[in-house]
Regions:
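A contiguous, well-structured "functional interface" segment within a domain
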Residues: 1, 49, 111
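Short N-terminal mixed-charge amphipathic segments
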Residues: 1-46, 123
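Charged interaction scaffolds used for protein-protein
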Residues: 24-38, 62-123
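Alpha-helix C-capping/helix-to-loop hinge sites
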Residues: 37, 53-60
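Short, hydrophobic/amphipathic alpha-helical patches that form generic packing surfaces
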Residues: 44-56, 92-96
Length: 123
C-alpha cells in the first residue's frame, strides 16, 4: 500500500466535521479525543480524523482542478491493514497538515512583520 498517495487537508469542512468528534465541539480539544486510553476508541477516532481530512483534501483537489482530479481511495479496511510504522507516518503527515492548514493569515502576516522589524533593527 502506497500511503504517500493519501493526502490530507484542514478545510472548513474538515474543521466542522472534526469539531463534531471533539469534546464540547471544540476542535482545539482534538488531543483529548486521540489520547483515549481505550485503544479501540483511540484508533476508531484516528481513522475518523484521517477519513475527514482525506475527504477534505479530495474535495479541495476536485474543486481546484476538476479536469485532472483523480480520487484516491481510503477506507477503514485500508486503515486496518496499516503497519505500526505506516500508522505513525500517516499520523505525522495528517497532523503536519492539521497544524499547517490551521494557521491563520493574520498569524502569517504577524510573523512577516516581526521578521521585517528584526531585519530593520539589525541594520
Amino acid at each position: 500500500m502506497d500511503i504517500k498517495k493519501i493526502k490530507f487537508a484542514r478545510t472548513v469542512y474538515a474543521e466542522r466535521q472534526l469539531a463534531k468528534l471533539c469534546p464540547n465541539n471544540k476542535i482545539n480539544e482534538i488531543g483529548k479525543l486521540l489520547s483515549n486510553p481505550d485503544f479501540i476508541k483511540q484508533t476508531d477516532s484516528l481513522f475518523q480524523v484521517f477519513d475527514i481530512m482525506h475527504r477534505a483534501y479530495e474535495m479541495r483537489a476536485k474543486f481546484d482542478d476538476p479536469d485532472n482530479f483523480e480520487p484516491v481511495e481510503f477506507s477503514k479496511e485500508m486503515f486496518e491493514c496499516l503497519t505500526d510504522t505506516e500508522l505513525e507516518e500517516m499520523t505525522n503527515l495528517a497532523f503536519e497538515n492539521f497544524e499547517k492548514d490551521g494557521r491563520t493569515e493574520i498569524e502569517t502576516q504577524k510573523k512577516k512583520e516581526e521578521v521585517s522589524k528584526e531585519t530593520n533593527e539589525s541594520i
